[in-house]
Amino acid sequence: MQFFYTPNFNPIILKVGCISFYWYGMMYVLSFIFAMWFLKYRKRYIVNDIFSSTSEIENLLYLNFLGVVIGGRIGYVLFYQWSMLSQDKLWFFKLWEGGMSFHGGLIGVIISIMWFSYCKNQSFLKISDFIVPAVPVGLGLGRLGNFINGELWGRVTFDIPWAMLFKNALLQDLLTLKIHPEWKFFFDYYGALPRHPSQLYEMILEGIVLFVVIYIFSCKSRPEGSISGLFLLLYGLFRIIIEFFRQPDIHIGLINNFITLGQVLSFPMVIFGFIIMYVSYKFK
């Protein structure tokens, strides 16, 4: 029988008394630190006509961070886990347990940029173009955090040598066996069903690849809005592709037995991204 790797990470970095520090939360801290450094670098060497001082960048990042956390959590509750609030009223605040929605976080960031651009009398797209190149690194680190937590695993596969066994997928495995009882032999042998490590797929595509493309594209002067449009377009496409390998949420499943909620939420990103890029180049 083929060997499949079983990730077995402790989600807690260290524990001091009754306080625990989690890898998932650390990914947000690292993302914030990188964004702070990278955007100051962009102001100094690439774009220097938007902010009068680095303190303005810091203020914007604080707003964005709040937008990501609040919007991401609200989005996750509304889109994926509304029922959890009825079981645990404080669950909304347990961010260390995971459970963030990119699309909700995106809405939160958009609102924070709108507020900042209004207060500073700056163009919304000009500011978003400045910020966007720093976003993919945060996305990649977030997916790494998902992998360490053993969540958001992929669909069952027996055809690839890098398939993995996720212990936290036990309930999903048992439900899958009801549909595919012929896989019970593999479940009994491995103790789990081998799955795509879709968190790592997302880390590579939405983190590394997207960062490289957006960074190279943003190093030259571009029409206002084109960088933001390219980000929306590429992220939407990458997410739609990866969703075919990612296990749909257990309580939602496939919509019309074909499409996932993540794909439904990503299609508008592709459309709006294309429109923004088209308009930005047509009227530059």
Swiss-Prot record:
<keyword id="KW-1133">Transmembrane helix</keyword>
<dbReference type="GO" id="GO:0005886">
    <property type="term" value="C:plasma membrane"/>
</dbReference>
<dbReference type="GO" id="GO:0042158">
    <property type="term" value="P:lipoprotein biosynthetic process"/>
</dbReference>
<keyword id="KW-0472">Membrane</keyword>
<keyword id="KW-1003">Cell membrane</keyword>
<keyword id="KW-0812">Transmembrane</keyword>
<feature type="transmembrane region" description="Helical">
    <location>
        <begin position="199"/>
        <end position="219"/>
    </location>
</feature>
<comment type="function">
    <text>Catalyzes the transfer of the diacylglyceryl group from phosphatidylglycerol to the sulfhydryl group of the N-terminal cysteine of a prolipoprotein, the first step in the formation of mature lipoproteins.</text>
</comment>
<dbReference type="InterPro" id="IPR001640">
    <property type="entry name" value="Lgt"/>
</dbReference>
<feature type="transmembrane region" description="Helical">
    <location>
        <begin position="98"/>
        <end position="118"/>
    </location>
</feature>
<comment type="similarity">
    <text>Belongs to the Lgt family.</text>
</comment>
<comment type="pathway">
    <text>Protein modification; lipoprotein biosynthesis (diacylglyceryl transfer).</text>
</comment>
<feature type="transmembrane region" description="Helical">
    <location>
        <begin position="130"/>
        <end position="150"/>
    </location>
</feature>
<feature type="transmembrane region" description="Helical">
    <location>
        <begin position="258"/>
        <end position="278"/>
    </location>
</feature>
<dbReference type="Pfam" id="PF01790">
    <property type="entry name" value="LGT"/>
</dbReference>
<dbReference type="GO" id="GO:0008961">
    <property type="term" value="F:phosphatidylglycerol-prolipoprotein diacylglyceryl transferase activity"/>
</dbReference>
<feature type="transmembrane region" description="Helical">
    <location>
        <begin position="60"/>
        <end position="80"/>
    </location>
</feature>
<protein>
    <recommendedName>
        <fullName>Phosphatidylglycerol--prolipoprotein diacylglyceryl transferase</fullName>
        <ecNumber>2.5.1.145</ecNumber>
    </recommendedName>
</protein>
<feature type="binding site">
    <location>
        <position position="143"/>
    </location>
    <ligand>
        <name>a 1,2-diacyl-sn-glycero-3-phospho-(1'-sn-glycerol)</name>
    </ligand>
</feature>
<feature type="transmembrane region" description="Helical">
    <location>
        <begin position="225"/>
        <end position="245"/>
    </location>
</feature>
<feature type="transmembrane region" description="Helical">
    <location>
        <begin position="19"/>
        <end position="39"/>
    </location>
</feature>
<keyword id="KW-0808">Transferase</keyword>
<keyword id="KW-0997">Cell inner membrane</keyword>
